[in-house]
Amino acid sequence: MSLQINTILKSRTEINDLEWNQFIDDSPQYIIYAKSFYLDAVHPNWKALFCYNGDQILAVMPLCEKSLFCFKWITKPSWTQYLGVFFCPLQGKRHRYYYTLKTVLHSILDQLKGKMHIFNYNFVPSFQYHIPFLWQNYSVTPYHSYHLDIDSSLSEIYSNFSTSVTNHIKKANKQQLLIIENESIDGLANLLQAKNIIHKGENLSLIRLWENLSKEACCFNMYVTDHNQSNMYCGGAFVIDKESIIFLASATNPKFKKSGAVSFMVWNVIQKAQNMKNIKYIDFEGSMIAGIENYFRAFGSRAVVYYNIQKKNHLLSSLKFIADKSNLRII
């Protein structure tokens, strides 16, 4: 039986939160970044493509559009590691399964034509069918994230840390550093901005995101201080997903960058995670920067491949870069 795919673009006001979030929850490509309360914080005017076969929704794709003058691009927002296409659970023979994926993706790609000048998304690791994008001259590039499984004992997890990590933890303990958890993200957001890791817009986006996540009880902040709580050594923002804790962001006070505070904080997050129901791993989110990638590996984490899919107009990419550096308003 052939599919009759009808793909419709819906604005944010046309999307029902309960239906959307239930679809994302049930999708094999599930990730918290695609939930409506997350997208509302990081890109309030998001839209989505809905792929129907009759009355059944086969797939959805959240779209985060930005524009400058008459040019448009679709890119992942700040604080969002992955997005992409989210399918409903598909049953049946394997050849039929791939036929459905191909047909739906062709319909989505047809809809994207003419709607944007640049496309750049990281797709969730569980999305593994990229061929239709290659056929349409998109580039598909493998990236790495790192997951630290926490299903073994704490002593076994600790034994797999590199010597540098264990030395950092010992150093922090000798200084009698303390772990503080509180609800405010302001201290971390301000430190990130002071170190020029993020700009003002990303600061506001992070604060808005934390308000939404706090309402859903799916986040926590961790700060490392001295025993008098007079100095903040570092801070971290963590998102609680179905089976993972996502290491969303961290920053270190430059005065204490050799204190071992970050490794000490991560070790405390691991201990906290082991006492949380359903949590199976820490998601470090990954980085293609050599020094950061090396640090994540030092905790004994495993590499997880995901794919960046993009189509670029090089002239417009340069224009976007100039706009970002000049702090031009991009809506």
What is each model feature region?
Residues P44-W46, G114-I118, K277-I279:
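Short, high-confidence coil segments that cap the C-terminus of an alpha-helix
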